[in-house]
């Protein structure tokens, strides 16, 4: 699926899966592992380059596409639903921090995490 078709599905509130999100990103973009911080203050999570690559790809893609917080969370598919089903849990910390801090909490340590193929 092209990234434009995928974004149209997302913006029309059709459910998307994590697998479809990553597949769409991989089809359209060249990925460079990049470290990033998610969150603010003591709650910030530092993700080293090459770790949590799904989250890194999704946040970079959403940023390029200028998606809002809710649209970005939807890209995580069932993982986002897992967090909603367990609001006091500790799994999927990148999703939890993004729910709390939004785009203000995302900081990439490098540029060009994703480039069009």
Predicted regions and their residues:
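Long, charge-rich, low-complexity intrinsically disordered regions
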Residues: 3-11, 112-115
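Short, surface-exposed loop/turn motifs that are enriched in glycine and acidic residues
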Residues: 7-15, 44-48
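Amphipathic protein-protein interaction modules
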Residues: 42-93
